[in-house]
Amino acid sequence: MKLPKPIIPVICTVLLLCSSAMQAQLPATAEGLEQSRLVTRATMYGVGLTNVFDTYLSPQEYTGIDFRVSRESMRMTRWMDGRLSLQSFFQADLGYTRNKADNNNTFSALANWNYGLHYNFPITDNFKLLAGGLADLNGGFVYNLRNTNNPASARAYINLDVSGMAIWNLRIKNYPLTLRYQVNLPLMGVMFSPHYGQSYYEIFSLGNSSGVVKFTSLHNQPSLRQMLTADFPVGRAKMRFAYIWDAQQSHVNDIKPPSYSHVLMVGFVKELYLLKNKRKK
């Protein structure tokens, strides 16, 4: 049966209106799915200044340059009504330092991985605060080029950190900008440290390993990591500038190996959407 020509435009209009009405009902559900599956990833490279002072190797302070790379992933979860966000942050740095007498050098390296959750507290539509906890894993070394008996010092420690963030989405003359400040404070953990004057040969070959793993907290490991980032679009890409202030301090087994770093970093940000892996039975 053929429809009269005047009715065809009416039917098309009704179908379009129904389609629009159906789409208008989707955002509430679709937005929930997007928030829990939208992953923000950033890779950055940076350079800065570092101070290394390890009394196990030398009583002198060494200063120099720090090269650093980082990889971060953040996404919202469905836990606690979608208020919990998951963060994974990995960074590795390599330092080359020299003493004040200008007659000796050291190489230092440290890999750090943070993984944990933050609860989101929206203050306004553009500003929110986050608070949570992170697992904090660290491993590295300091190598003194002139020492012969004990040329290197290992660094290995695990912490439970308290962490906080402030994220602000703003516009400067219609140009979008996202600012973030994050601070991580180690609350408690365990650290490997030889006794002062004890060689690694005694620990691993002779078995004199008593007391080389110690409990740490604010009283003997007052450390702090702070990071300030700025995300902004450049064409179709999104860039990130970051400043990291990394202060690692401890006083365990009469050894003090503090290190302080100020690093400027730059990189790119990607936003990915995780799809469900549907398997056919």
Residue spans of the language-model regions?
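Outer-envelope beta-barrel architecture signal
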Residues: 34-43, 80-88, 125-133, 173-179, ...
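Predominantly the C-terminal beta-signal and adjacent terminal strand-loop region
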Residues: 176, 182-184, 192-194, 214, ...
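Cleavable N-terminal export/targeting peptides
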Residues: 1-37, 274-281
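Short glycine/proline- and aromatic-enriched beta-strand/turn motifs that initiate or cap beta-hairpins
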Residues: 24-87, 281
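Residues that define the transmembrane beta-barrel architecture of outer-membrane proteins
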Residues: 61-70, 105-113, 127, 152-162, ...
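Transmembrane beta-strands of outer-membrane beta-barrel pores
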Residues: 47-53, 92-98, 135-143, 168, ...
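Outer-membrane beta-barrel transmembrane domain signature
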Residues: 149-236
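Residues on the lipid-exposed face of transmembrane beta-strands in outer-membrane beta-barrel proteins
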Residues: 67-77, 111-119, 133, 160-168, ...
